[in-house]
């Protein structure tokens, strides 16, 4: 546990380093800390903080910079978030961006607004497409070809083209749609499949054929899993802390391309309440100590369905990025729930 003097100096050092990007020396700490301390006393405290692994001294400078461990202590115990006025400005921007519309477009807009407001990379883990349906409609395209339209409880509209063994008239398709919606709406397609086995003797053959085809078309699609949307990854090329080492930056862009570890991180974050902050290697996202990830889950009708966040340098203004992520998650939840 740090004493108040050491806490003040560490907080001042991190705030100045975030603002200026240069190692912080004792003269700067004396000027901004508000403490009446001699340069020698400040240097002694800095030496103690270095022994604790909270700051390091680059070889080319007499000043010091925070370590990931130092950032962690700062974020957990010393951080003051932006003022109410700043949060209101963020809220207005996010509300304007997240206009009602198709859920996929709203989620993509959330990734974009995260990137634009933070000036880093915005990421959103999209909801896993529901195998539960709210409504189904069949539309005849041509002989033995039918368009299956599925509406999920989240408001997502999915289209499938079905090839059938025989032709169906428009009236038969309407009858099948009405029957399915009346008897099976709100169930998963696996439940529908199970119910069909139980009720097959009570149904006409053509009705059974259509429903089996609909269930198969709905559950055989490979795009029902979660996906990651990324916006503004090129912003990271403008971050001096990262662009100075292109080899490490290429590793990060490989992660963006493959998305597997990013999906795993966001999936883990969705099981925690509120904003989560992963500093340096805590994320296990990339072998880059200079990266941090700020995430928050979002909901539809009170149920967590995904995660969003910002990826940027450890030298990010956490007091500004945390409200951006938190507000975007809350407003995305509200917008999707109102669909």
UniProtKB/Swiss-Prot annotation:
Q: Name one Pfam family in it.
A: HrcA
Sorted alphabetically, the keyword list is: Repressor, Stress response, Transcription, Transcription regulation
Could you state a single Gene Ontology molecular function term?
A: DNA binding
Q: Does the keyword Transcription regulation apply?
A: yes
**Taxonomic superkingdom:** Bacteria
Single biological process term from Gene Ontology: negative regulation of DNA-templated transcription
Q: Tell me its family.
A: Belongs to the HrcA family.
The record's section on PANTHER family has: HEAT-INDUCIBLE TRANSCRIPTION REPRESSOR HRCA
Its biological purpose is as follows:
Negative regulator of class I heat shock genes (grpE-dnaK-dnaJ and groELS operons). Prevents heat-shock induction of these operons.
Specify the protein name.
Heat-inducible transcription repressor HrcA
Question: What is the organism of origin for this protein?
Answer: Paraburkholderia phytofirmans (strain DSM 17436 / LMG 22146 / PsJN) (Burkholderia phytofirmans)
